Amino acid sequence: MYGGFLCGILSLICELAKGFIPVYLGQKYLDINSLPFVPVLVAPVFGHAFPFLQKEKGGKAITASFGVLLGLFPELHPAVYLAFFFIFFSVVVIINPHSLRSILTFGFFAFNVLLTIKTASIQIGCFIIAGIVIYRHLIKHNNGPVRISILHQR
C-alpha cells in the first residue's frame, strides 16, 4: 500500500528533521569545535540505523545523515559532498546495486570531509556516520551482479 506523493514528501521532511533539529539546536548550546558535539551528530543516524525497540527493523540512515549534515548550517560543505557523490554515482558513473553505490558514496564523502573540513568534531562525526551507513549496507548487501556504467553506456 502506497501513501502517494504527499505522504512521501511528508515522510522525507520528517526523516530530514529527525537529524536536522538535534544538530541545529545542539550547535546553539554546545561548542561545535568540542568533542561533546560528536554524539549530537552521530545519535540521530545511529538511532535510525539501530532502533532501540525494533532491533532488526533499522533503516540504512541515508536521509537521517542528510538531515544531520543540513543541521550544521551554515557549514554545508559536508552535505554538499554527500549530495555530490550520490548524484555522481547515480547519474555519471552509475553503480548498481544501490547498496554498493551507497558504500562508495559514504566512503568518498568521509574522505573528502577529512581532507577539507578543519573542525575535528565534524570530521569525527562524519567519519562515524559514514561507518554506520556503510555497515548497514554491508550487512544488507546482496551478492548479486555489480553493474557499472558511464552516463548510461555499458
Labelled PLM ranges:
Residues 1-3, 26-29, 47, 62-95, ...:
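Interfacial segments of multi-pass membrane proteins
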Residues 1-8, 58, 142-154:
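Cytosolic, membrane-interface loops and tails of multi-pass inner-membrane proteins
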Residues 11-15, 36-44, 60-68, 81, ...:
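Alpha-helical transmembrane segments of multi-pass membrane proteins, especially transporters
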Residues 77-84, 98-106, 117-130:
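Loop-to-transmembrane alpha-helix initiation sites
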